Regions:
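A generic structural motif
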Residues: 16, 27, 52-54
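Short, conserved secondary-structure segments in the cores of folded domains
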Residues: 11, 36-39
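Extended boundary segments
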Residues: 1-16, 78-81
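Short alpha-helix capping/helix-loop boundary micro-motifs
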Residues: 32-36, 53
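Short, compositionally biased
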Residues: 38-40, 60-74
């Protein structure tokens, strides 16, 4: 997927463990999901790191806090790539 600047965007689901990237957009299907991600600190320009992958969840850090999110939430986080 390319954004208006011609840069490639991908979701957090495609990021391997141990990678830090920058959020370029939150693209959620509903406002509850979007608001939840915002409450975690997921905003455009923020750095986000994938710490590990579990069977159904991804462990991330953002703003020095660690969270476990599912693949639906991860697919709503578009990162540089």
């Amino acid at each position: 997927m390319k954004n208006n600047d011609g840069l490639k965007e991908r979701t957090l689901n495609s990021v391997p463990e141990g990678t830090t990237c920058t959020i370029v957009k939150i693209q959620a299907d509903d406002t509850d999901m979007e608001n939840f991600l915002f409450s975690l600190g997921c905003f455009e320009g923020e750095e986000i790191s994938v710490i590990s992958r579990l069977e159904q969840n991804i462990i991330i850090t953002i703003k020095e806090a660690r969270y476990s999110i599912d693949s639906d939430l991860a697919s709503a986080i578009l990162i540089d790539g």
